[in-house]
From Swiss-Prot:
Subunit field text: Homotetramer.
Family: Belongs to the bacterial/plant glucose-1-phosphate adenylyltransferase family.
Keywords: ATP-binding, Carbohydrate metabolism, Glycogen biosynthesis, Glycogen metabolism, Nucleotide-binding, Nucleotidyltransferase, Transferase
Reactions performed catalytically: alpha-D-glucose 1-phosphate + ATP + H(+) = ADP-alpha-D-glucose + diphosphate
InterPro entries registered for this protein in UniProt: ADP-Glc_PPase (IPR011831), ADP_Glu_pyroP_CS (IPR005836), GlgC_bac (IPR023049), GlmU/GlgC-like_hexapep (IPR056818), NTP_transferase_dom (IPR005835), Nucleotide-diphossugar_trans (IPR029044), Trimer_LpxA-like_sf (IPR011004)
One of the GO BP terms on file: glycogen biosynthetic process
Enzyme class: transferase
Pathway(s) this gene product operates in, as recorded in its UniProt entry: Glycan biosynthesis; glycogen biosynthesis
Keyword hit for Membrane: no
Binding-site positions, alpha-D-glucose 1-phosphate: 100, 165, 180-181, 191
Chain segments annotated as transmembrane: none
Protein name, UniProt field: Glucose-1-phosphate adenylyltransferase
SUPFAM superfamilies: Nucleotide-diphospho-sugar transferases, Trimeric LpxA-like enzymes
Length: 383
């Protein structure tokens, strides 16, 4: 097997508990996004567009739909004989198997997979972030700095630093301190969960971490601090572009709404950096004679007979006559009946909302889980 300069390992096993009923039956990276995508499509597309064609996807929680979506990687040009995409569930030993105990443990359990390719570098990625990034540029930075580890960082508002791992750097971006979700941060450089490591170095620290019974087996809590304490040369790679951790209902709704802005940074129409997904064969969208659509995305296969404003109507969904969809996301194959008002909501896949119902009041985000059947004349408002 030819040696790879760099392979990627995507952490995609998260339960996504903060997304509530949207992840009751599927992993967070498999949640629909933007009308025709799933969240994991972004990191897979980034790998392909960056020339990384050997990809391990580490799954765990409710993996069936995610595994089916990824398949052999054809939509992302990852169905290759020399490389490809591999779904890696928790390792099963003769004595039984355990779930991944943490992000570092997930990589540790797959050391043999990485060793098969004998890469010089490994890039560790999260499968639940929305962004477009050229990892080849980050690797170039890593080499120029002669770094052992490089962490991609993005500037965040000071009031949000408590949600992230925060890096403190010298003027040349060398990292001298890492604060995991600090109450009082010293900088606003937040880790994006994108790491490049020299593989031999990372493997050594993973094995040492595994032998520490008090470790959480986590990159942010254990591996990165341990490396810094050992004097490992670590740099921060500044990323300037759109990036969103869609781990909450609020952030998922915001990321979808961001797509509807005229000057949206993500720009899914950019032909130079396409976001690929599984393309189901759908008929063209149908817009009824009395439909009214404004500042919205309506994907192939949907039918719209009512009013849609600042919303996303996903593939295969139907909006009934005299219905109003405002500031909302209707996920794939949902059926909205006649005379329904949906205002500031996330409606899951395969949902039926029957006639004369009201969903949401435009203040808090109302969420309806997948496969729900909302009876006629219902009133559902987030409390």
């Amino acid at each position: 097997m030819d040696r790879k300069e760099m392979i990627s390992m995507i952490l995609a096993g998260g339960q996504g508990s903060r997304l509530g009923i949207l992840t009751k039956k599927l992993a967070k990276p498999a949640v629909p996004f933007g009308g025709k995508y799933r969240i994991i499509d972004f990191v897979l597309s980034n790998c392909s567009n960056s020339g990384i064609y050997t990809v391990g996807v580490l799954t765990q929680y409710k993996p069936l739909e995610l595994n089916s979506h990824i398949g052999i990687g054809t939509p992302w040009d990852l169905d290759r004989r020399d490389g490809g995409v591999y779904v890696l569930p928790p390792y099963q030993e003769e004595s039984g198997g355990n779930w991944y105990k943490g992000t570092a443990d997930a990589i540790y359990q797959n050391i043999s997979f990485v060793d098969n390719y004998n890469p010089e570098y490994v890039i560790i990625l999260s499968g639940d972030h929305i962004y477009k990034m050229n990892y080849a540029n980050m690797l170039k930075f890593h080499k120029e700095k002669k770094a052992d580890v490089t962490i991609a960082v993005i500037e965040v508002p000071i009031e949000e630093t408590y949600r992230f791992g925060i890096v403190n750097t010298k003027s040349d971006m060398e990292i001298y301190e890492f604060q995991e979700k600090p109450m009082k941060a010293k900088s606003t450089k937040a880790s994006m969960g994108v790491y490049i490591f020299k593989w031999t170095l990372l493997k050594r620290f993973l094995k040492a971490d595994q032998s520490d019974k008090n470790s959480s087996n986590d990159f942010g809590k254990n591996i990165i601090p341990n490396m810094l304490n050992s004097g490992i040369k670590m740099y921060a790679y500044p990323f300037r572009g759109y990036w969103k951790d869609v781990g909450t209902i609020q952030s998922l709704w915001e990321a979808n709404m961001d797509l509807l802005k005229e000057d949206n940074e993500l720009n899914l129409g950019d032909l130079n950096w396409r976001i690929y997904s599984v393309n189901h064969v759908e008929p063209a969208q149908y817009i009824g004679p009395k439909a009214n659509i404004k500042s919205s995305i309506a994907v192939n296969g949907c039918e719209i007979y009512g009013e849609v404003k600042n919303s996303i109507i996903s593939s295969g969904s139907i909006i009934g006559k005299n219905s109003k969809i405002i500031d909302s996301v209707i996920m794939p194959y949902s059926k909205i009946g006649d005379n329904v008002i949906i205002n500031k909501a996330l409606v899951g896949s395969n949902v039926v909302v029957r006639k004369n119902s009201i969903i949401g009041d435009g203040r808090e985000i109302t969420v309806i889980g997948s496969n729900k059947d909302i009876k006629a004349e219902s009133l559902l408002v987030s409390s």
